[in-house]
Amino acid sequence: MKIILTHEVSGLGTAGDVVDVKDGYARNYLVPRGFAIRWTKGGEKDVAQIRRARKIHEIATIEQANEIKAKLEGVKVRLAVRSGDAGRLFGSVTPADVAAAIKAAGGPDVDKRRVELGSPIKTLGGHQVSVRLHPEVAAKLGVEVVAA
């Protein structure tokens, strides 16, 4: 079945790509969750709109990505989160929390989908986080999680 991706799907492609997948995968997973729509001739207009929106948020060149990487690595990120006595958090730190903390610390605006946590952050202390700016460029930064 031909579908148009509306979001980035690991192993398939990015938003706006037209891909061919098995019928069950499309009907039972991708379409109900909003990751894709069925391909139609009218859907081609949607593809153009999705691609325009993607270009706005896309970092075009490696040079731009390296500039943003330099800015990111100079930012000290601290997150104040509620925690218990033993240093365990109530919940966990999400990529959206990290992206908001980067912005609050004076860093560049980063999309939460670009923030990659190695494993869920559920304890106080220092943690390593990477931000995938370009397929070839990733910024590594330290995030300090403190009790609120």
Curated annotation (Swiss-Prot):
The keyword Metal-binding does not apply. One of its GO terms (molecular function) is structural constituent of ribosome. The keyword Chloroplast does not apply. One of its GO terms (biological process) is translation. GO terms for cellular component: ribonucleoprotein complex; ribosome. Pfam families: Ribosomal_L9_C (PF03948), Ribosomal_L9_N (PF01281). Keywords: Ribonucleoprotein, Ribosomal protein, RNA-binding, rRNA-binding. Signal peptide: none annotated. Belongs to the bacterial ribosomal protein bL9 family. Binds to the 23S rRNA. PANTHER family: 50S RIBOSOMAL PROTEIN L9 (PTHR21368). This is Large ribosomal subunit protein bL9.
